[in-house]
Amino acid sequence: IKMNNKELQTLIKSQKANHTLDQKFYIDDDIFELDLKNIFSKQWVFVGHISRIPNFGDYFLFEIGKESIIIIRDKKSNIHAHYNVCRHRGSRVCLEQQGNNKLFVCPYHAWSYNLDGSIKSARLMNDDFNPDEWRLNSCNVKIFEGLIYINLSDNPVGFEDFISPTRKFIELHGLGDAKIAHRAIYPTNGNWKLTLDNFHECYHCGPAHPEYCSVHDKEYIIAYGAGGGTGPASDKFNKILNDWNVKAKKL
């Protein structure tokens, strides 16, 4: 029997404060499917930086759940996000993880698509074939400070609502003028929440990242002992953070 949203809410409400999540959140297949449906298929997701595709026709693939998304720059320098699925028989359109294409050509039956997703050619179709109805399915895409975000939902949450809590923090760094100097992929053999848990706590920072700790105030590290706001110095740290936020709004 598959777990539904109501059962998931019950499990969440039974969670003890300041404790790790129940084991089911990390190993249950149904919960993972709900994660994909309720979070990754509805929320804005960062996929890369514009400097990764600087030229006309440059593209890369981004995998999200079971979906493969083509991120590509067209001749007018607009960036598009298309599902990597031919509308004819569902074949993958792009087989390489990255590259440069001036035209998408399906390797199965040679349907071809322009970079904006419209059909260029569909061989031997009937006279009543309407190419406008068979363009590549696209998803929402937004560029903010050089960062590319996509949203798979048909009714996405407003991008401004999504980005506003971090807007000032991101704008300070001038990422729109940045370029990627190096890329590295670190596959994680585990649930995505494990990686997020590791990022959100700094209890491990002392033994695991001594150089990082050497350039931060000790109380900053302590305040993130088991996650944001859980350490004994969190009140003092939060005051400092709030003061900084006030200053950031004035910039």
Give residue spans per PLM region:
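Short, Lys/Arg-enriched N-terminal segments with co-localized hydrophobic residues
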Residues: I1-K2
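Short, contiguous pre-domain boundary segments
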Residues: L8-Q23, G176
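A residue-level signal for conserved active-site and pocket-lining positions in enzyme catalytic cores
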Residues: D35, V141, T195
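Rieske [2Fe-2S] iron-sulfur-binding domain
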Residues: R52-D154, E160-F169
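C-terminal catalytic domain of Rieske-type non-heme iron oxygenases
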Residues: I72, L147-L251
